[in-house]
Amino acid sequence: MQLVVCGVLGLVLGLYAFTLPECPLSQSNDKRNLAQRLGLDAFVLFKSKTMAMFFIFSMLLGVSLQITNGFATPYIESFSAVSDSWFANNPTMLVSLSQISEALCILLTSFFLIRFGIKKVMLIAMFAWVLRFGFFGVGDTETIWGIAALILSCIVYGVAFDFFNVSGAMFVQQEAPQSMQGSAQGLFMLMTNGIGASVGTYIAGKVVDHFCTWEAGHLVSRAEFANGWQSTWFIFAGYALVVAVMFMILFRYKHDRSKMENMTH
């Protein structure tokens, strides 16, 4: 049923797109070379220490993003194997909380970015990742506190995702030259959803395979289930905490509130 609803909504949105006003591409007389056409010119941004550090930590945060993309839903769904509670048998509800939180928190990103600057906003996102993984580590579907931890983890996901992805894209738009805006955004996506996601998939997979042996059909007790996932999520939380502390120490940027307020996006 869910796939049918998604298909119908996709068709409706596709038809709606035909009613939108035409937005012709701007005509430029500049002749771009092959490197510019491929977006490779954005790599010159690494000459700036601030931008280089930003992109490196974007990659490290991309690892956290891939961890939750790859294993948050399987983790929540796996409770049904060891629990008969309502939450264990309705994992979609918990997963949907993350999506709702993401949709609501996106409204806050501009305000926080203008008021506090990219460093503080990204630090908020990083510590939100720590809480996201930490709450998963102590969560369960049998106790009130465990259920509350799972709910809080799903709620804090909106902050973790939006305060990094959305504010990061806005920061790149602010700092990159006008001539390479598109290339710079592509580089940001490469570092997060490309390199970061690939590294995150590999490392997270190794950690889960090591601690969650029942994934291969060897689950023997509820305790093994809990201990395996708990160790896994605490390792991920520790990783996110180390990244946050390193970012706090290494990233240097003086926030210009007026510059951010005047930015068009």
Question: Where are these predicted regions, by residue range?
Answer:
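A membrane-interface helix-boundary motif in multi-pass transporters
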Residues: 1-8, 206-240
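Multi-pass alpha-helical transporter architecture, strongest
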Residues: 12-21, 212, 229-265
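Juxtamembrane intracellular "pre-TM" segments in multi-pass secondary transporters
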Residues: 21-54, 81-82
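Pair of pore-lining "gating" transmembrane helices in MFS-fold secondary transporters
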Residues: 47-68, 155
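Short amphipathic helix-loop junctions that connect adjacent transmembrane helices
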Residues: 70-91
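Helix-to-loop junctions at the C-terminal end of transmembrane segments
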Residues: 104-118, 208-209
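C-terminal ends and interior cores of transmembrane alpha-helices
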Residues: 127-143
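Intracellular juxtamembrane helix-capping segments at the cytosolic ends
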Residues: 163-177
